[in-house]
């Protein structure tokens, strides 16, 4: 395969994977990213235009009889980078999609597949679900969702890269191995589907993994640490640019 083409595809994949896959689109603009997020939470596009509606949403948070009772708005506001009003809007959309107050993995996969109808996002959504499910109980609560979204949208570069590393580190042992990276890359290629037209060779994911490790495995010990990952990403203009696209999309 042409070396320049591999490098170009690698850059696209790094942008997509380093930000949870939300960024990959034909036109990676703040508007297109916002549209994707609103598609995930359709009711979040509705404005809480009056105090009565705002109070209604707040009452839902405090008095809900759903299976999972979310934390108080004030606590979530302190733990995230969203305002109280933004949390009210996001909760309305979340509860509309997930009346029980939590999202299981199958529902998460169904929702996420809307982002990538041209491919198969099932495996990548599994990895992404595990990144949001921080307490590993098999469900993503509103709190889990908000904390992850807060990092992706408004976190510092360091926070976003830590989140991305955790996504790659499948077994959570503090290292990214070639096997883990290959699993992630295969999932991303499947997810992107027609976006990789013309169709790439079967060994393309493995080639991307080799490129990734040549760039990031500084001491050549066969694994990538969090420090190596962050240092390499901070020197990559494409990845840094993709991080900025997330700012203020809500």
UniProtKB/Swiss-Prot annotation:
Main location: membrane
Record PTM Phosphoserine, positions in chain: 17, 56
GO biological process: protein localization to plasma membrane; regulation of potassium ion transmembrane transport
Membrane topology: Peripheral membrane protein
PROSITE patterns xrefs: EF_HAND_1, EF_HAND_2
Tissue: Expressed in brain. Highly expressed by neurons in layers II-IV of cortex and in hippocampus, thalamus and the Purkinje cell layer of the cerebellum.
The protein's name in its UniProt record: Kv channel-interacting protein 4
Organism: Mus musculus (Mouse)
Lineage of the organism: Eukaryota, Metazoa, Chordata, Craniata, Vertebrata
């Amino acid at each position: 395969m042409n070396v320049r083409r591999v490098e170009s595809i690698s850059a696209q994949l790094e942008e997509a994977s380093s930000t949870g896959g939300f960024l990959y689109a034909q036109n990676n603009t703040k508007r297109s990213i916002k549209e994707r997020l609103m598609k995930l939470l359709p009711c979040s596009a509705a404005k809480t235009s009056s105090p009565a509606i705002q109070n209604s949403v707040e009452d839902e948070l405090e008095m809900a009889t759903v299976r999972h009772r979310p934390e108080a708005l004030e606590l979530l506001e302190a733990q995230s980078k969203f305002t109280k009003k933004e949390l009210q809007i996001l909760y309305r959309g979340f509860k509309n999609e997930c009346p029980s107050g939590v999202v299981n993995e199958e529902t998460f996969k169904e929702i996420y597949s809307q982002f990538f109808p041209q491919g198969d996002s099932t495996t990548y959504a599994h990895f992404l679900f595990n990144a949001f499910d921080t307490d590993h109980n098999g469900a993503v609560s509103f709190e889990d969702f908000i904390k992850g979204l807060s990092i992706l949208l408004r976190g510092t570069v360091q926070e976003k890269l830590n989140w991305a590393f955790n996504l790659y580190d499948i077994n959570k042992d503090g290292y990214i191995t070639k096997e883990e990276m290959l699993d992630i890359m295969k999932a991303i290629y499947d997810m992107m589907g027609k976006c990789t037209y013309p169709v790439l060779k079967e060994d393309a994911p493995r080639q991307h993994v080799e490129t990734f490790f040549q760039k990031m495995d500084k001491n050549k010990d066969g694994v990538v640490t969090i420090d190596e990952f962050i240092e390499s990403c901070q020197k990559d203009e494409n990845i840094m640019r993709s991080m900025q696209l997330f700012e203020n999309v809500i």
